[in-house]
């Protein structure tokens, strides 16, 4: 026995395919027309920033040259997606998933709607942060995949960079302020100038990671690159000067010390440096010897 033929009619509007289903009509023909949406959904944006609840524990720096984003700690990502680049053809989003450095973090996504409750054409401000996840020193990769109710999908990749390596103070250079005796002094000869002003130039550099990359030490704004010089008993007699930065990635800053005879013997100098994401160097302390050699 042969059944009668059934033909599926394409609905007038694309959204009817999802909301109302396919309509069947009896026909004498054996032909069947099946309608489906082959336009893939898209991840419209992935952005990153320091987590709001993280306070000052993570610092962000964006390099001007290549626009790479560097962090010293945890990162928060913001995701947006929509069902189709063509606003007239939507079957609705079925799922949004994400990985971080290859690890599925979909359960960490905040702000997702219940996709089975209604047809969702777009999602915005979907967030997750890296708390509890392993951060790579250097490149860290987020991949977001969106799938619609027609089974079409697309994936977008986004990279950020992490620098947790401390910079290093590489040099102390001592000079007298007087131009007629403007020779470079080693720290051991520092003691012969016990009644003059002394200029101390402290140099520091950021350390490369395994990828031969770093956030750098050239961005001189608050909470970024910095060099400071300290004296426990004579801090008020240290005047901080200007910075200089060279092509080798070395940042220098010159300080002037008021070396009166009485307080000079008490000078013990400590320098610290911060890179562009404010990793702090070890403290480097130099104490004036009892006598010049």
Q: What kind of region is each of these model predictions?
A:
Residues 1-293:
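Low-complexity, disordered linker/stalk regions enriched in Pro/Thr/Ser/Gly
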């Amino acid at each position: 026995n042969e059944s009668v033929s059934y033909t599926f009619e394409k609905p007038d509007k694309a959204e009817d395919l999802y909301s109302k289903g396919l309509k069947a009509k009896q026909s004498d023909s054996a032909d069947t027309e099946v309608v489906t949406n082959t336009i893939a959904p898209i991840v419209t944006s992935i952005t990153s920033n320091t987590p709001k609840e993280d306070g000052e524990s993570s610092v962000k720096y964006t390099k001007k040259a290549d626009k790479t984003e560097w962090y010293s700690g945890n990162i928060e990502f913001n995701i947006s997606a929509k069902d189709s680049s063509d606003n007239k053809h939507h079957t609705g989003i079925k799922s949004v998933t994400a990985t971080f450095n290859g690890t599925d973090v979909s359960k960490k996504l905040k702000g997702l709607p219940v996709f089975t409750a209604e047809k969702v054409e777009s999602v915005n401000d979907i967030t997750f942060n890296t708390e509890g996840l392993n951060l790579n020193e250097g490149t860290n990769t987020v991949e977001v995949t969106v799938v619609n109710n027609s089974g079409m999908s697309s994936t977008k990749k986004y990279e950020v960079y992490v620098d947790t390596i401390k910079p290093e103070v590489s040099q102390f250079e001592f000079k007298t302020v007087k131009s007629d005796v403007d020779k470079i002094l080693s720290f051991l000869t520092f003691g012969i100038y016990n009644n003059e002003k002394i200029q101390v130039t402290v140099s520091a550099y950021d350390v490369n990671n395994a990828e031969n990359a770093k956030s750098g030490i050239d961005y001189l704004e608050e909470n970024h690159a910095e060099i400071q010089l300290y004296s426990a008993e004579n801090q008020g007699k240290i005047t901080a000067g200007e910075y200089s930065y060279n092509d080798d990635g070395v940042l220098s800053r010159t300080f002037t010390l008021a070396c009166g005879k009485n307080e000079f013997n008490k000078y013990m100098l400590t320098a610290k440096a911060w890179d562009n994401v404010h990793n702090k160097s070890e403290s480097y302390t130099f104490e004036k010897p009892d006598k010049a050699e």
